[in-house]
């Protein structure tokens, strides 16, 4: 498709006339619709293959035109310089996504790459790093190259990288021994191993496992920020800032001069101690002697295209006023300096005076720029058919008769075949082989997608998309923006940090104080140091670390510490044990009951089912497909289904449920879709109607929005079997509703129903298939204990065209709020404004109304009557309001695809899981969502709040919540699954221990023998310094991770693997680590030989075998193998256990390793037959 439309256009006279002057002189091109314009621009780029700059008035327009251009130009050649709005960018902590796109763009330009660069106005005017300085900081490292390590590390800091002990996020680097790890903004994390100052090897590595993979010969390291800050820049900044401070001070009110002094001092302090790019970017106008703008990065022969010039001029005017107001507010309040700015004040067109510019506008209008040519195109919109086949047939026939070339773009290969056969049935000839020459009067159906179709009458060309045929939305063309791996979303909530609460299986809740190396006797070992009540401390040898878990409970709860040696912990554990046993009994009864009961067994999928599923306009995610298969498998079995489908907000649970409902209807069964609120009922009802409009399925709704007459008719229809699917609130559970043949009950968010309703659902479950949907994740640990009791399906992958919500953490400021509101409303979107104080919520609305006089603003809170609240929400969904000022009542369940900006005041007061769920309200369509978490300006955040906001910022990836925020939700989910009263028990022993106890109880009741996950304990006591010294591994977390791995080693292969990892991550290891590995090696062989104890007696080593191993060993073989040890080895038997003594010599450790290996090899292998 890329070449076909473009080729067709390139041969047209009108395009050739345009091509001659395009990029040579100032021209105006008018009359083209957005997708036709994208087509012409893309064709010009493909033909000339030079750098091309395309300026739009805002990021929304840039995104829109980019989507269409990507249909023609390969995504490796399309670049965007995404800037939201200048002030928010400079004053907030931002997600790395946009930053990496900006860095990619600047780097490509600085290296003279060809490409089509799309830039919104505020990105075009922004002050940037001088081009030469940027070029100096492009680094390519090659194997064999000699580097000055200090200068190299210094350069990384200039480029915006942060030094950490372990690299886990974009923009970090670490140095351990001779190993440098770097996670660049573009590309994969790399590990550089040095031999003195020479680059010995470069490998990419995985941040999740910290292991390196393939060797590479060279790596390009891009900057981690769009500003480069060197020592010279800091020097220049200090001088300029001092001048600005001295100039500003006398010009402002005396009352705020102290504030100005504080602002100045804080910046000065910041520069001298540790400069943070996020903070210093506010001072960009003082940083460089001659800052650049984006146009300075382009080559002289670049082609410049401006989209809708007059609209850009309007935006520029607003932008200039906004920045000036913003800065004067800062200056007047003592928070800013005269001369502090972010962009070039020269007008936009003045920046382009040196270049020939092609201006594209839809209508011809007067423009204040010199023009040499005006080229007018005639372009018509395409008829919207929306599935009306008669109109479609007559229009297509008209095109064919008039010798038009018609190109129909559809999104998948299967749809190509379906549309072709549909058109062939209308007797319209179609072609699918787009490589042959296309004649007029033909219809080509091919894969592709544009935002809309267009008709160019002069060229006799019509392009029609699915949107015109069937009203489906364009699928977003994904660009290769780097998605952040799960590892980065925050390693795991199990990471132990000093000060964390822990649970020791035998001693209870304590506090983790770190790893300490202690000298006991003459040997050094590592111990985990724990603090208990009062001054009690416990040192746990690292090889017993599996008895210590991180304490995880409901959000932000601090537990009481236990007393060492007290009875309190024993009592607590006994109570919890009783409770999990009761639950286990309940679960087992339920399990037996389900196995015994018989329900309806559905048949295999029908042809209608396949047609219905093909109709879905999006690709299913792998998790959705798996869930659908699991549900259909349940339905096709005789026992009733009871499955829980859990997936993050907006991950496509509804589509899975809709397919199950359709399957039930095709087998002549009725379906009840039960939801907690009237609004959700309305939304699900509309979804079902839209999805099933082409199939003979009768769908009805029972809710307060229906008249008594409609509800009466629905009830009759359910009783007679006329109604196939009914959607409704708890009214569906009423005694007055009778079904002719109910086959499937779908329950959305069961935990939100009352006790009475839950009981009614329980009775229905006995002989009807039940599918329950929930957005609260169910913890993995519970999946295991629930296996076979309640079936679970999990959707963890987001749909293809969902974008991460761009998350900003900002100080509260009216300018930011106004800007965010204006940006969303300018793209015809809506805003959730979260204000959690009911008593002053109406004042907040008035305040916002003064900021945005033209906006329609509504209020929603929990003290309104249910009817008022529902009507307000419905009006908001129907876009009667632009802004909804609301409390946390929106946390669950409402889907407003058009609301894509969320602003939360005092975000520092919210819990992590709450912020995560609230943020899931936006970014639900294919538009990018924005979330602004505001905290009061002069308030010092407490540590927890700061960590929380930091975490939110880091999980800007979709669904990344399955990590840290999910900790709290997991516990909530566990409570929902097991009953609210379990919350207290979970909190008393911590979530992990609770899950473990539950799993053991369930398995015991089901008669399943627990396979020990860890190796049986072999006591090895040797007088050796065997530990991980702090000089070798600085990070305590990394230390604990390695000790955990060593504890699980059961084979030589696994041991080699850990050795490789140590060398890979921390370089060659010292003697203490070698001794530690020797002990693990001895344990591995001892484990397979049935050895129970290896003990250092001073002059000899004692080895005791288990009675079973004593029976199994082949004594003759052992003596034969151990001959080299001579008299150093003695063997005896005591209490049915073999006792081997090894006299110590100089090389006693090697002798011991040899001996244990011999014992293992002497075990008699039983014949299999």
Swiss-Prot record:
Residues that bind ATP, according to the entry?
A: 647-654
Q: Which UniProt keywords apply?
A: ATP-binding, Cytoplasm, DNA damage, DNA repair, DNA-binding, Helicase, Hydrolase, Nucleotide-binding
Question: InterPro entries given for it?
Answer: CarD-like/TRCF_RID, CarD-like/TRCF_RID_sf, DEAD/DEAH_box_helicase_dom, Helicase_ATP-bd, Helicase_C-like, Mfd, P-loop_NTPase, RecG/Mfd
Which is a GO BP term held by this UniProt record? regulation of DNA-templated transcription
| Annotated Gene Ontology cellular component terms | cytoplasm
The entry's localization annotation reads: Cytoplasm
**Top-level EC class:** hydrolase
Enzyme Commission no: 3.6.4.-
**All residue ranges annotated as the Helicase C-terminal domain in the record:** 809-970
Superkingdom as given in the UniProt entry? Bacteria
The protein, known as: Transcription-repair-coupling factor
State the encoding gene.
mfd
């Amino acid at each position: 498709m890329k070449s076909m439309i473009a080729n067709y256009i390139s041969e047209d006279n009108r395009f050739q006339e345009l091509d001659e002057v395009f990029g040579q002189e100032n021209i105006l091109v008018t009359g083209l619709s957005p997708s036709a314009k994208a087509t012409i621009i893309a064709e010009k780029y493909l033909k000339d293959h030079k750098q091309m700059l395309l300026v739009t008035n805002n990021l929304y327009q840039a995104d829109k035109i980019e989507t269409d251009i990507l249909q023609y130009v390969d995504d490796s050649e399309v670049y965007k310089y995404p800037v939201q709005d200048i002030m928010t960018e400079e004053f907030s902590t931002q997600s790395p996504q946009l930053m990496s796109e900006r860095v990619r763009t600047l780097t490509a330009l600085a290296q003279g790459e060809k490409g089509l660069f799309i830039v919104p106005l505020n990105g075009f005017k922004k002050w940037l790093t001088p081009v030469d300085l940027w070029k100096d900081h492009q680094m390519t490292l090659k194997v064999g190259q000699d580097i000055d390590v200090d200068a190299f590390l210094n350069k990384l800091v200039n480029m915006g990288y942060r030094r950490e002990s372990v690299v886990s996020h974009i923009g970090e680097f670490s140095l351990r021994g001779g190993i440098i790890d770097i996670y660049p903004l573009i590309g994969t994390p790399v590990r550089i191993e040095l031999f003195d100052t020479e680059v010995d090897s470069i490998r990419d590595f995985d941040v999740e496992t910290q292991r390196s993979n393939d060797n590479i010969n060279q790596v390009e390291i891009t900057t981690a920020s769009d500003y480069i800050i060197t020592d010279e820049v800091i020097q220049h900044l200090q001088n300029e800032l001092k001048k600005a401070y001295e100039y500003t001070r006398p010009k402002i009110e005396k009352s705020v001069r102290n504030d100005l002094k504080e602002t100045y001092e804080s910046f000065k302090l910041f520069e001298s101690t540790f400069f943070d790019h996020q903070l210093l970017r506010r001072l960009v106008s003082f940083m460089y002697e001659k800052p650049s703008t984006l146009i300075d990065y382009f080559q002289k022969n670049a082609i410049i295209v401006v989209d809708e010039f007059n609209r850009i001029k309007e935006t520029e005017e607003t932008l200039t006023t906004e920045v000036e107001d913003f800065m004067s507010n800062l200056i007047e309040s003592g928070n800013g300096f005269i001369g502090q700015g972010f962009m070039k004040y020269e007008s936009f067109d003045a920046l382009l005076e040196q270049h020939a510019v092609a201006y594209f506008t839809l209508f011809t209008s007067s423009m204040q720029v010199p023009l040499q040519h005006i080229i007018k195109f005639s372009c018509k919109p395409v008829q919207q058919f929306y599935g009306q086949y008669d109109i479609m047939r007559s229009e297509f026939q008209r095109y064919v008769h008039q010798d038009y070339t018609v190109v129909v773009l559809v999104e998948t290969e299967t749809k190509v075949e379906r549309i072709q056969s549909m058109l062939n049935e209308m007797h319209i000839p179609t072609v699918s082989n787009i490589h042959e020459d296309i004649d007029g009067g033909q219809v080509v159906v091919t894969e592709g997608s544009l935002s809309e179709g267009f008709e160019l009458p002069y060229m006799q060309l019509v392009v029609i998309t699915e949107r015109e045929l069937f009203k489906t939305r364009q699928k977003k063309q994904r660009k290769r923006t780097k998605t952040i791996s799960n590892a980065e979303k925050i390693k795991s909530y199990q990471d132990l940090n000093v000060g964390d609460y822990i649970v020791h299986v035998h001693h209870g809740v304590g506090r983790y104080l770190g790893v300490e190396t202690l000298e006991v006797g003459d040997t050094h070992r590592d111990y985990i140091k724990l603090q208990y009540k009062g001054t009690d401390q416990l040192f746990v040898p690292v090889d017993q670390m599996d008895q210590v878990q991180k304490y995880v409970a409901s959000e932000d709860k601090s537990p009481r510490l236990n007393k060492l040696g007290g009875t309190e912990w024993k009592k607590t554990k006994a109570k919890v044990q009783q409770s999990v046993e009761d639950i286990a009994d309940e679960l087992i009864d339920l399990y037996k009951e389900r196995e015994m009961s018989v329900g309806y067994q559905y048949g295999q999928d029908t042809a209608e089912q396949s047609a219905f599923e093909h109709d879905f306009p999006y690709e299913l995610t792998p998790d959705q497909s798996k869930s659908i298969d699991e549900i259909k498998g349940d339905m096709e079995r005789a026992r009733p289904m009871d499955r829980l489908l859990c997936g993050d907000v907006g991950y496509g649970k509804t589509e899975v449920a809709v397919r199950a409902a359709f399957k039930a209807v095709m087998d002549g069964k009725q379906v009840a879709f039960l939801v907690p609120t009237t609004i959700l009922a309305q939304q699900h009802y509309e979804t079902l109607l839209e999805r099933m409009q082409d199939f003979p399925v009768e769908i009805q709704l029972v809710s307060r929005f229906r008249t008594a007459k409609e509800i009466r008719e629905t009830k009759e229809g359910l009783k007679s079997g006329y109604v196939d699917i009914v959607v409704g609130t708890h009214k569906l559970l009423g005694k007055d509703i009778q079904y002719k043949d109910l086959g499937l009950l779908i329950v959305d968010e069961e935990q939100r129903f009352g006790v009475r309703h839950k009981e009614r659902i329980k009775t229905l479950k006995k002989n009807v298939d039940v599918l329950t949907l929930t957005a609260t994740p169910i913890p993995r640990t519970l999946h295991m204990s629930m296996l076979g009791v309640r079936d679970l399906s999990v959707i963890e992958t987001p749909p293809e065209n969902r974008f991460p919500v761009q998350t900003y953490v900002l100080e509260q400021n009216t300018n930011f709020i106004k800007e965010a509101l204006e940006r969303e409303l300018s793209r015809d979107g809506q805003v959730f404004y979260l204000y959690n104080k009911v008593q002053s919520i109406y004042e907040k609305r008035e305040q916002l109304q003064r900021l945005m006089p033209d906006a329609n603003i509504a209020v929603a809170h929990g003290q309104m009557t249910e009817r008022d609240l529902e009507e307000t929400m419905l009006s908001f969904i129907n876009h009667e309001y632009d802004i909804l000022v609301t409390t946390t009542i929106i946390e669950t369940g409402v889907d407003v695809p058009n609301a894509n900006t969320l602003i939360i005041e005092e975000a520092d007061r919210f819990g992590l899981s709450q912020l995560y769920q609230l943020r899931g309200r936006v970014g639900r369509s294919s538009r990018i969502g924005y979330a602004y978490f505001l905290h009061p300006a002069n308030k010092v955040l407490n540590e927890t709040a700061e960590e929380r906001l930091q975490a939110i910022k880091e999980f800007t990836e979709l669904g990344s919540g399955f990590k840290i925020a999910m900790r709290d939700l997991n516990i909530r989910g566990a409570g929902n699954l097991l009953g609210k009263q379990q919350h207290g028990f979970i909190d008393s022993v911590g979530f992990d221990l609770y899950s473990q106890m539950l799993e053991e109880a369930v398995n015991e009741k089901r008669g399943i023998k627990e396979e020990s996950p860890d190796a049986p304990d072999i006591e090895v006591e040797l007088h050796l310094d065997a530990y991980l010294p702090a000089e070798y591994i600085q990070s305590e977390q990394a230390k604990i991770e390695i000790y955990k791995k060593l504890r699980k080693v059961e084979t030589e292969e696994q041991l080699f693997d850990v050795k490789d990892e140590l060398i890979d991550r921390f370089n060659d290891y010292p003697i203490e680590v070698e001794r530690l590995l020797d002990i693990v090696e001895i344990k591995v062989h001892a484990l397979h030989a049935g050895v129970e104890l290896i003990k250092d007696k001073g002059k000899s080593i004692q080895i005791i075998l288990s009675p079973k191993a004593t029976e199994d060993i082949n004594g003759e073989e052992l003596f034969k193998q151990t001959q080299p040890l001579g008299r150093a080895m003695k063997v005896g038997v005591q209490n049915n256990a073999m006792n081997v003594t090894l006299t110590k010599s100089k090389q006693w450790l090697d002798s011991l390793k040899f001996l244990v290996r011999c014992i293992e090899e002497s075990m008699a292998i039983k014949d299999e037959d």
